[in-house]
Amino acid sequence: MLKFYDREFSSRLLIGTALYPSPKIMQDAIRAAGSQIVTVSLRRETAGGRTGDAFWSLIRELDVTVLPNTAGCKSVREAVTTAKLARELFGTSWIKLEVIADNDTLQPDVIGLVEAAAVLIKDGFKVFPYCTEDLGVAMRLVEVGCKVVMPWAAPIGSAKGIVNRDALRLLRERLPDITLVVDAGIGAPSHAAQACELGYDAVLLNTAVAKAADPVAMAGAFSLAVEAGRTAFEAGLMEARDFASPSTPVVGTPFWHAVS
């Protein structure tokens, strides 16, 4: 089972709610993914008016856990304020914390992120921080009280998949008791499977499903990929080798194949 703070879930695929061709397709895709947790932007919900009400109605029909985020925030103050508004609106202490340093790369402001996380945790929030794959940053987030860390695979929406595999592997090795979620940069089901094969507890994605030619079918594909990757990790993957190693035993080889 996947554990986030004091709650357990069976699905290891978290999915976003933006960019879909229609609300109905979004709803069908989330169902196909089997996701139990969806991320929602506070800015979309508060700016939507009646459209926001209809969107929220669709989310309630799915019977999923909502993880609001602070997407678009560029300062500690803005992120903390947005998180507090999200707690009031959605009735949850969970927050996906994003503090963005640059609009072009959407790279996290890791200094502001740690500061904001510390403030929110003291205020009773359960923080899900979006960060880079830097081990030092992840350790600081854990030190201030984060039980979940969400490093990117690649920049948001880039669809590049895992760019720094060694760094993500190191995070998993050094933070064995922390729930780790690969967040951002996933473009194909194979990328999600690779993340789970590394031992990551879950994958969070949005654009790869929402912008697919068939979002519903793609959501199903990601669900299968995450399950396959996790099963492979638990089964124990063989280590890569630099040289060939015969898979067929030589014992019992017919004598005429023997080399004199």
Curated annotation (Swiss-Prot):
Its EC number is 2.8.1.10. Pfam families: ThiG. Keywords: Cytoplasm, Schiff base, Thiamine biosynthesis, Transferase. It comes from the Bacteria. The active site is at K96 (schiff-base intermediate with dxp). It catalyses: [ThiS sulfur-carrier protein]-C-terminal-Gly-aminoethanethioate + 2-iminoacetate + 1-deoxy-D-xylulose 5-phosphate = [ThiS sulfur-carrier protein]-C-terminal Gly-Gly + 2-[(2R,5Z)-2-carboxy-4-methylthiazol-5(2H)-ylidene]ethyl phosphate + 2 H2O + H(+). CDD domains: ThiG. InterPro entries: Aldolase_TIM, Thiazole_synthase_ThiG, ThiG. 1-deoxy-D-xylulose 5-phosphate binds at G157, A184, G185, N206, T207. One of its GO terms (biological process) is thiamine diphosphate biosynthetic process. It is an enzyme of class 2 (transferase). One of its GO terms (cellular component) is cytoplasm. Its main location: cytoplasm. Pathway: Cofactor biosynthesis; thiamine diphosphate biosynthesis. Coiled coil: none annotated. GO terms for molecular function: thiazole synthase activity. It is found in: Cytoplasm. The keyword Transmembrane does not apply. Belongs to the ThiG family. Catalyzes the rearrangement of 1-deoxy-D-xylulose 5-phosphate (DXP) to produce the thiazole phosphate moiety of thiamine. Sulfur is provided by the thiocarboxylate moiety of the carrier protein ThiS. In vitro, sulfur can be provided by H(2)S. Homotetramer. Forms heterodimers with either ThiH or ThiS. This is Thiazole synthase.
